[in-house]
UniProtKB/Swiss-Prot annotation:
Its main location: cytoplasm. Plays an essential role in the initiation and regulation of chromosomal replication. ATP-DnaA binds to the origin of replication (oriC) to initiate formation of the DNA replication initiation complex once per cell cycle. Binds the DnaA box (a 9 base pair repeat at the origin) and separates the double-stranded (ds)DNA. Forms a right-handed helical filament on oriC DNA; dsDNA binds to the exterior of the filament while single-stranded (ss)DNA is stabiized in the filament's interior. Residues 346-465 are annotated as: Domain IV, binds dsDNA. Belongs to the DnaA family. Residues 1-80 are annotated as: Domain I, interacts with DnaA modulators. It comes from Acinetobacter baylyi (strain ATCC 33305 / BD413 / ADP1). This is Chromosomal replication initiator protein DnaA. NCBIfam families: DnaA. The gene is dnaA. Oligomerizes as a right-handed, spiral filament on DNA at oriC. Transmembrane segments: none annotated. The keyword Nucleotide-binding applies.
Length: 465
């Protein structure tokens, strides 16, 4: 069934929480040339329309081989339709017991995929760009600002040698895929006929092996080497795939020879990819390599507020602050925490407040209470820099103690829910302004001093492991 196939693809494209909460409950009805989706209520319908209908429409057109080019989203007002508690009006029972009604259409519920959407797929189901991965929906902060600015610059100088290839590296879940696909989406917006291909390293291997088995290697080469923009995620996963590495090496060279833009992502800096062919690693460094780091607390707050706004959720700032203080690893975990808070609030039929947030994140809070505290941070920092704990906490202001102390204060603010005065008390009774200054100093030194930044990242990994 078409909708079943579409659900399989949507499960791959969306997070587990979003898929389970918003997509799975939809009821589908297929006609000769259209697909109707029924949602439980107007709020649900509006959310799907604003956030997922374009993606669904692209997939439906693709999976039906062009037969279905119209997708409708309808409010299912039939008796027995389920409403989420938070959205259920007081008159629901009376309304449903009245005369039978037909599904009510909401405004602008029909999406007609543009003919140019075929460029996003580029003859393969794996070439789909996520329409939500745009620059306007990307939240910038100190940790990712350079990467975002570089990606925008690439658009104005596509294929220029100084940033070709563009290599984005950093831990998983920080927005590297969002940024690289934002370049693809922006290019297609400006030039609908541009040839853009997005793929993971794993899908490159699968497609290449499939082309060998089917005797279509030349077609595979032509598709990959006639692009304007090639986007490859998790390039480090090519390790050990010798035949695929050789093919990618020649594809890479062919595109660069034609000044076609390549953007790659990895969890490590190019020179750390020792398991890949040294010739390929060397070429990764020909252009520009930009790191993406875990977001600081201010950026985490803005990410939460923007995600909530885009989902039509009222998230008070104090609740966003609380979530940001507890979830520090990456953006995906932030989104998962927010989804859980929203789900609990809807289930209870209540507004989001600190009580709901604490209940939703009780497992996270329990884990953090056992693992990360100011005292634990002080111990790890003193051991890392090999200085006595009493000197880290004490009054001495010499550089050998002051820098680690500032770093420990910054990490305490970043990783715990403690206030500035509480952190100050833990560091020998210092006042809140001293802690604030230390946190500001940490943020500036991370940008200015590579050694300090490396120490910060090492300590963050130690504390989160």
């Amino acid at each position: 069934m078409l909708w079943t196939d579409c659900l399989t693809r949507l499960r791959q494209e969306l997070s587990d929480n979003v898929f389970a909460m918003w997509i799975r409950p939809l009821v589908a009805e297929e006609t000769t040339d259209s697909l109707r989706l029924y949602a439980p209520n107007p709020y649900w319908t509006r959310y799907i329309q604003e956030h997922h209908l374009e993606l669904i429409s692209i997939l439906v057109e693709q999976l039906s081989e062009g037969r279905i080019r119209q997708v409708e989203i309808l409010v299912d007002s039939r008796p027995g339709a389920i409403l989420s508690p938070a959205e259920q009006p007081a008159t629901t029972t009376a309304a449903l017991s009245s005369t039978p009604v037909v599904p009510q259409r909401v405004k602008k519920e029909v999406v007609e995929p543009a003919a140019t959407q075929s460029n996003k797929i580029l003859n393969s189901k794996k070439r789909l760009l996520n329409p939500l991965f745009t620059f306007s929906l990307f939240v910038e902060g100190r940790s990712n600002q350079m990467a975002a600015e570089t990606c925008r610059k690439v658009l104005t100088q596509l294929g220029a040698s100084q940033h070709n290839p563009l290599f984005l590296y950093g831990p998983t879940g920080l927005g590297k895929t969002h940024l690289m696909q934002a370049v693809g989406n922006a290019l297609l917006q400006a030039k609908p006929n541009a040839r853009v291909m997005y793929m993971t390293a794993e899908s490159f291997v699968q497609d290449f092996v499939s082309s060998l088995q089917k005797g279509k290697v030349e077609e595979f080469k032509k598709n990959c080497r006639s692009l304007d923009l090639l986007l490859v995620d998790d390039i480090h996963l090519l390790a050990g795939k010798e035949a695929s590495l050789v093919e990618f090496f020649y594809t890479f060279n062919a595109l660069l020879d034609e000044s076609k833009q390549i953007i790659l992502t990895s969890d490590r800096y190019p020179k750390e990819l020792t398991e890949l062919d040294p010739r390929l690693v060397s070429r990764f460094s020909w252009g520009l390599s930009v790191g993406v780091e875990p977001p600081d607390i201010e950026t985490r707050i803005e990410i939460l507020l923007k995600k909530a706004e885009n989902s039509g959720v009222d998230l008070p700032r104090n609740c966003a602050l609380f979530i940001a203080q507890q979830v520090v690893a990456n953006v995906r975990e932030l989104e998962g925490a927010l989804n859980k808070v929203v789900a609990i609030a809807r289930f209870k039929g209540s507004q989001i407040d600190l009580d709901v947030v604490r209940e939703s994140l009780k497992d996270v809070l329990a884990i953090r209470a056992r693992t990360i505290s100011v005292e634990n941070i002080q111990r790890v920092v003193s051991e890392y820099f090999r200085i006595p704990l009493k000197e880290l906490i004490g009054p001495k202001r010499t550089r050998i103690y002051a820098r680690p102390r500032q770093l420990a204060m910054g990490l305490a603010r970043e990783l715990t829910g403690d206030s500035f005065p509480e952190i100050g008390m833990a560091f020998g009774g210092r006042d809140h302004s001293t802690v604030m200054h230390a946190c500001e100093k940490v943020q500036s030194l991370k940008q200015e001093d590579p050694i300090f930044n490396e120490d910060y990242k090492n300590l963050l990994r130690l504390l989160q492991s």
